[in-house]
Amino acid sequence: MSVVMLVFRVLLLIALVGNSAIGLSLMPFIAPPDPDWTPDDYYYSYEQSSPDKDASVTQTSPENPDWYYEDDDPCQSNPCEHGGDCIIRGNTFSCSCPAPFSGSRCQTVQNKCKDNPCVQGDCLITQTPPYYRCACKYPYTGPDCSKVLPVCRPNPCQNGGVCSRHRRRSRFSCACPDQYKGRFCEIGPDDCYVGDGYSYRGKVSRTVNQNPCLYWNSHLLLQENYNMFMEDAETHGIADHNFCRNPDGDHKPWCFVKVNSEKVKWEYCNVEVCPESDAANPVGSLQEPVMELPGFDSCGKTEMTEHAVKRIYGGFKSTAGKHPWQVSLQTSLPLTTSMPQGHFCGGSLIHPCWVLTAAHCTDMSTKHLKVVLGDQDLKKTESHEQTFRVEKILKYSQYNERDEIPHNDIALLKLKPVGGHCALESKYVKTVCLPSDPFPSGTECHISGWGVTETGEGSRQLLDAKVKLIANALCNSRQLYDHTIDDSMICAGNLQKPGSDTCQGDSGGPLTCEKDGTYYVYGIVSWGQECGKKPGVYTQVTKFLNWIKTTMHKEAGL
């Protein structure tokens, strides 16, 4: 099957009706492509229900399938950054920002170092009063780095190093014991990096040109993309220090250095690659084996507040970090004349090295596939994204299509480690749990995706909505799918508000259901009919639990 024909058949549309979502399979033909299409050429069309009607939630029943409700609140996604409080003001909002942040969304860090209060040191921005501190150059000390300590008293050399004074009172040197180095003998023999150094957490703070690194919260870095106040800084090992790091996936650790009083540049660091014998457990790196990583500490947990998690977004831009297990499958192949290469299917991260998706999304070579984790905006490369190649595709052996309907539509993607690791857990990248028991009909669940359609139209922003599970007996009724739903499938959606709609969601993406604050991937977006009128059809994950676990263990050699 050609790639173009494949894409015609794999992309599932989940209809947003009012603020609800149901599924649609592709027609056997495609509309003439728009040569001027860009990812921004889309719109949301939805009907608003009356406030009185939306204020109540009716009980579910086959006669009254009201499986969806909404809650419009400008603060529901907490648009305020850096811990700001969102305050509703009519139909809009304002942000109450904690110091030292300001701006309409608390996005700006106030520079408390403009008057250069540090005489012999670097002025650093902090989040506690007076919202700055001075990092003094040795042997200077004091709140403004103006006082000089007696050199070598006390001994600044670490790990048994011996301090020697020079003629100039501020000059000294450390004689380091064997295998230790650095200005203060602070760098040990195992301080090295593996791979590209993304996981490096050592203490080297000098560049290959022997320039000292700036602190990541230096006031000089406030306009840089990488600093202590960036999204997910801790995940990248960035904090109140000046140690070398590699947050952007360059080929080795680096840092910023000072050029003059106002200008900075970056340089690679003077840190060594670990010898092969030490590469498995470098002291300065996250210790994760390549072949099989242990799972994250927990699954199915977001770092959103409970209040925010339970709100409905229904077709609006999803909050970053609300679906941290959402995966974007992307290809280097052109999909259609109107759909450029890039995102074409969704998936769910169920283990640091494993992605769960639909089998019909995997009819191409691994060399043309990549997996992007933590993605929110398809047109931007965001700092918290993690990208991996696919090492292996494993489809369920009994996957097949009959009358253009996929059966047993499930596959696993084994990720190829980068720098000795697969996915690293962060606010934006987490695993979702596998369910152990079925969820009852009427359970409210979540769908998410970028809404890619067969003509290439879709949202650049991740969208989400809530739907409710529908009993297979009802979904198999003559008015719906007329006995085409088998026990490996589950339906979810809304039949209450047919009409003007925009479709969202991606084949292979997750249908997640929550229990006791934990999210489980209960379904995989598979197929559907009549966008906006019939429920979406999902692969029921509980039917394949044994295959999923057995496959992962077999590939790990367990």
UniProtKB/Swiss-Prot annotation:
Cysteine disulfide links: 75-86, 80-95, 97-106, 113-123, 118-134, 136-145, 152-163, 157-174, 176-185, 192-274, 213-255, 244-269, 299-433, 345-361, 353-422, 445-513, 475-491, 503-531
Gene3D superfamilies documented for this protein: Laminin (2.10.25.10), Plasminogen Kringle 4 (2.40.20.10), Trypsin-like serine proteases (2.40.10.10)
Primary location: secreted
Entry's Gene Ontology cellular component terms: extracellular space
Gene: Habp2
This protein's name: Factor VII-activating protease
Active site: 360, 409, 507
Protein family membership: Belongs to the peptidase S1 family.
Record's comment on post-translational modification: Proteolytic cleavage at Gly-23 or Met-27 can give rise to the 50 kDa heavy chain (HC) and cleavage at Arg-311 or Lys-317 can give rise to the 27 kDa light chain (LC). The HC can undergo further proteolytic cleavage giving rise to a 26 kDa fragment. The LC can undergo further proteolytic cleavage at Arg-311 leading to a 17-kDa fragment and at Arg-478 leading to a 8-kDa fragment.
Highest rank taxon of the organism: Eukaryota
A GO BP annotation: proteolysis
EC numbers: 3.4.21.-
